[in-house]
């Protein structure tokens, strides 16, 4: 089972959700823990529709979002189920931890109860507030209150007619509030963000040194020291002589943008017509790295001060520029500014619904250039000039099979193919800019892997994350770091594979371990004879062509057959198994099911599922 599915993998996600909920409910019953299946399923739903989509990643923000936003907004259940939702959530998270599914980059399992208790303090009042529900939930509850069968379309149609005719009493004031919330998007879930590649960051000392070298940090520090009760004009601007003095001090033509930046960063303020430094900002100014990060965070509020200040980009600066930096994040080589100009212009056209006007386009391009110049002076990006890497033009032509259309309109692709053939301005994030951009994405709840962050992860968590979120090269680097921190011992990793009750998960864990380990092929060959891992290892060896069916004994073949059926049940649910069996004559299907059900396969949890969902119903005498 995976704990990450793309938004369009509906069937795969639903099968995984059903499996995890079923296993968790059984696990909870054995321990006497609360586990309402509606809450378990909703918790997984809430993570699937989130910005990062990681079902098993839970921190304080995710816990609070589920209990204080998702449950009151969406879940329709008995009052007792709603009241005890925090208990059911804790059971789910404990089950994820116990089975090795919990993402180690979230809260430690020991810290989860406190996070749930913290959110649960506000939960009763929030879940009882009708203004927290969605419009869809309001109408669904109203229909249920009137005895409408939600599975009966005719009954639903009659109920709608009664509403239209005014025969169903409604809370119109509440409806107005819910409709406004829906219109403003307040009741909408976050859209899934693009996955980001794992990156490496320099040591903290190097980051601090880079911040101290920033020209913008130097200028903001000088400005802070200079701004000692300076008089302003009636329009709130520096007097001409003072502006010239400050410009000379800072080494700029005009100090206006830096003044705005300093005010936005909380370094100076205007008091009774005079510019004064803020005393509480003194510790910040003395810490170059802290000042750099404050300046970076406040940069996105400077749209009106960057460039011309009156282009479309300035209006949407705080939305578009972060997306531009996210695009630069993790790129293996400098990105051509021309390509970014095209995508930024397309984004601006969507915001304003303007045609491809040369005047507006020139203003957007100029402001984007000005933004890059300011970020370069800050030290967040580096600007160079040259031929762009072929990577940035390789997707501009239609693919040979036509399956993947270019990501941009045809006329834009044609324009870029011409421009990118010649040298031009290039931009990439500096290590400092990468660090700051990553911090922003982390704050937004996005998945932004960092090479080295899993060195202390539990074995199951390490392999699970590598299998789902790391490319091969980065997985090998991360695995090497983990082994280095654990005396090169692979046995804990192999034991994690053995302990995993989800066979498809165990297979993925073994695959990433063998693929990233220097002695992976030899490891797989040795594991062929492992009592628990053997069926998975043999399957991998056969798929790789390093083991033929002639090399397999009858017991080996039965073990592999059982492994395949258990994997099919996990991935597709009972329906997938029934579909497969339907391709066989009935006697052969029954014989196969009997063989799997009585197999000595070393996966008791998966075999129990097979007995319950497949073998018992199919082989029961009629």
Which residues fall in each region the model found?
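Accessory beta->alpha helical hairpin/"wing" motif in late/C-terminal subdomains of nucleic-acid enzymes
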Residues: 64, 103-117, 256-260, 265, ...
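Long, helix-rich interaction regions
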Residues: 114, 118-125, 129, 133-173, ...
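Short amphipathic alpha-helical interaction segments
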Residues: 81-91, 250-264, 358-386
């Amino acid at each position: 089972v995976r704990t990450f599915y793309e938004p369009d993998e509906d069937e795969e996600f639903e099968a995984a959700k059903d499996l995890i909920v079923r296993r968790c409910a059984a696990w909870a019953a054995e321990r006497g823990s609360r586990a309402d299946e509606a809450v378990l399923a909703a918790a997984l739903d809430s993570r699937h529709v989130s910005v990062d989509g990681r079902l098993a990643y839970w921190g304080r923000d995710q816990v609070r979002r589920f209990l204080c936003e998702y449950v009151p907004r969406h879940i329709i259940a008995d009052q007792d189920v709603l009241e005890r939702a925090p208990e059911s959530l804790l059971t789910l998270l404990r089950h994820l931890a116990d089975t090795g599914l919990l993402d180690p980059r979230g809260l430690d399992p020991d810290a989860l109860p406190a996070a749930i208790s913290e959110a649960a303090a506000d939960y009763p009042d929030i879940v009882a507030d009708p203004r927290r529900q969605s419009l869809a939930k309001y109408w669904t509850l109203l229909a249920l209150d009137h005895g409408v069968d939600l599975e009966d379309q005719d009954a639903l149609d009659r109920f709608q007619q009664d509403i239209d005719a005014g025969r169903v009493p409604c809370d119109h004031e509440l409806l107005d509030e819910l409709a406004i919330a829906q219109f403003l998007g307040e009741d909408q879930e976050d859209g899934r963000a693009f996955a980001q590649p794992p990156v490496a960051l320099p040591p903290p000392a190097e980051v601090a040194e880079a911040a101290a070298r920033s020209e913008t940090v130097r200028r903001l520090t000088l400005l802070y020291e200079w701004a000692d009760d300076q008089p302003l004009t009636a329009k709130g601007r520096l007097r001409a002589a003072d502006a010239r003095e400050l410009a000379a001090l800072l080494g700029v033509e005009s100090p206006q943008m830096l003044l705005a930046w300093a005010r936005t960063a909380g370094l100076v303020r205007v008091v009774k017509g005079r510019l004064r430094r803020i005393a509480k900002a003194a510790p910040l100014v003395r810490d170059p790295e802290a000042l750099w990060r404050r300046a970076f965070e406040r940069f996105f509020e400077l749209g009106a001060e960057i460039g011309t200040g009156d282009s479309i980009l300035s209006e949407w600066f705080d939305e578009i520029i972060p997306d531009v930096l996210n695009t630069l994040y993790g790129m293996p080589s400098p990105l051509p500014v021309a390509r970014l100009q095209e995508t930024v212009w397309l984004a601006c056209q969507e915001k304003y619904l303007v045609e491809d006007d040369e005047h507006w386009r020139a203003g957007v391009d100029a402001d984007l250039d000005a933004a890059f110049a300011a970020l370069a002076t800050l030290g967040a990006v580096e600007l160079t000039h040259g031929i762009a890497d072929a990577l940035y033009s390789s997707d501009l032509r239609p693919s040979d099979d036509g399956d993947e259309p270019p990501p941009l309109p045809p006329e834009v692709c044609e324009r870029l193919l011409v421009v990118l053939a010649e040298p031009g301005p290039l931009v990439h994030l500096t290590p400092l800019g990468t660090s700051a951009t990553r911090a922003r994405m982390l704050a937004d709840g996005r998945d932004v892997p960092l090479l080295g962050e899993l060195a202390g992860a539990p074995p199951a968590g390490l392999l699970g994350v590598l299998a789902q979120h790391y490319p091969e090269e980065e997985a090998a680097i991360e695995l090497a770091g983990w082994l280095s921190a654990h005396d090169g011992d692979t046995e804990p990793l192999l034991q994690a594979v053995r302990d995993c009750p989800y066979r498809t998960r165990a297979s993925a864990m073994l695959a990433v371990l063998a693929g990233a380990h220097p002695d992976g092929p030899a490891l797989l060959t040795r594991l062929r004879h492992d009592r628990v891992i053997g069926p998975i290892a043999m399957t991998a060896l056969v798929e790789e062509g390093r083991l033929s069916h002639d090399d397999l004994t009858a017991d080996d073949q039965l073990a592999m057959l059982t492994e395949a059926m258990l994997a099919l049940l996990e991935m597709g649910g009972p329906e997938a198994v029934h579909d497969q069996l339907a391709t066989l004559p009935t006697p052969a299907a029954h014989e196969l099911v009997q063989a799997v059900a009585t197999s000595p396969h070393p996966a008791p949890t998966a075999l129990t599922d097979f007995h319950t969902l497949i073998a018992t119903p199919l082989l029961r005498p009629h």
